[in-house]
Regions:
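Glycine-rich phosphate/diphosphate-binding loop of Rossmann-like nucleotide-binding domains
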Residues: 15-16, 28-33, 39, 147-216, ...
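N-terminal phosphate-binding or glycine-rich loops at protein starts, especially the Walker A/P-loop
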Residues: 1-43
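Glycine/threonine-rich beta-strand-loop-alpha-helix active-site module
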Residues: 97, 103-153, 157, 163
Length: 340
């Protein structure tokens, strides 16, 4: 298993990226290919105590980087030798089993689509983070890759999320819900109403276990295993979860500091609070998979530290070993999707 990592992507590149890559190599025993400025990568490795890279860790040198200000639609035409582009090209050409980048989300999605390519028959790749729920976790698809969607896109997202839940989360029969403002069939815009009809048809064929519309609050309670939505609404939901978690943590911290009694109470509940905090910590999650691309691509968050990169590599290995891309390609013709 070899994981290709864009060493120059993210706010903390290359030091934290290289540090996380070295930790992942030691932890998982996988091969690592770092793409980027060779001098900078070696200097970062030296700072991590690796004057010489260990066997199994290689560098693919590049001369350019994708900056956050670069236009995702044109960056790979203007810059021919970027660390991100090289990672995706190596992945396409079979030099690795998955790619990880903490760089620009838009550029990574565009590059994955143009360079690594979508699975034949998939109209739009989607971002599918695994979010915490009261009872466990759920796949949220899409959460930012496609702000505007058609009912057909959402239907495909349901299938993609279903495969991810089965293959990666090991849910035998995922419950698929359509994010909406109410559970009734009459709720939502034309997009939700038309998608609802398509998903009910898929359920009737036995392709999906569709439970109907679901409100965000019910989804967070564990009401379904796959939450289907457009990228705009999904991103709002994801950022709200992150914001509420941060708010709750700050509020509890302030409350427990009030007096001696509250400080003593904090000691009693600290293990539970730490567990809650870890479930919401993006560094523990690692990254988000782009589902629908022909090879596994993992987007680590822009502020990733070494721990996040290490966990993103672990996630990349899990996705690659799950065979999800092969399963999607194998079953794409059986999904009975409306033709374009």
């Amino acid at each position: 298993m070899n994981i290709i990592i864009d060493a120059m992507g993210g706010d903390n590149a290359p030091l934290e990226i290289v540090k996380g890559a070295l930790s992942a190599h030691a932890r998982f025993g996988c091969g690592i290919t770092l793409t980027g400025d060779e001098t900078a990568i070696r200097a970062a490795a030296a700072q991590c105590g690796a004057a010489q890279l260990p066997a199994g860790v290689a560098i693919h040198p590049t001369t350019e980087t994708v900056d956050m200000c670069d236009d995702p639609a044109t960056v790979f035409r203007r810059k021919k030798d970027t660390s991100m582009g090289a990672a995706l090209t190596l992945l396409r050409d079979g030099a690795g089993d998955a790619a990880v980048s903490a760089g620009s989300t838009g550029a990574l999605l565009t590059g994955a689509t143009l360079i690594t390519k979508r699975i034949h028959g998939i109209r739009r790749a989607a971002m599918a983070p695994v979010i915490p729920t009261t009872t466990g976790s759920a796949v949220l698809i899409d959460c930012g890759a496609n702000a505007e969607c058609t009912p057909e896109y959402l239907l495909q997202f349901a299938y993609l999320g279903n495969f991810y839940a089965q293959r990666v989360l090991n849910v035998a029969r995922p419950r698929v819900g359509l994010l909406n403002i109410g559970a009734e069939d009459s709720k939502g815009t034309d997009l939700q109403k038309q998608t609802l009809a398509l998903l009910r048809e898929a359920d009737g064929r036995g392709d999906l276990h569709f439970i109907g519309n679901i409100e965000a609050k019910e989804a967070i309670k564990g009401g379904c295993d796959v939450i289907v939505t457009d990228g705009f609404s999904g991103n709002v939901m994801l950022k709200t979860i992150e914001g509420v978690g941060s708010f709750a943590g700050s509020a509890l911290k302030t409350m427990f500091k009030k007096n001696l009694l509250t400080k003593l109470a904090a000691l009693l509940v600290m293990p539970g609070l730490n567990e809650f905090k870890e479930r919401l910590d993006p560094n523990k999650v690692g990254g988000t998979a782009f589902i629908g691309i022909s090879r596994p691509v993992i987007k680590a968050h822009g502020g990733s530290n070494a721990e996040a990169i290490e966990n993103a590599v672990g996630q990349a290995i899990q996705v690659a070993q799950s065979g999800i891309t092969e399963a999607i390609a194998e079953h794409i013709d059986k999904m009975q999707l409306p033709t374009a």
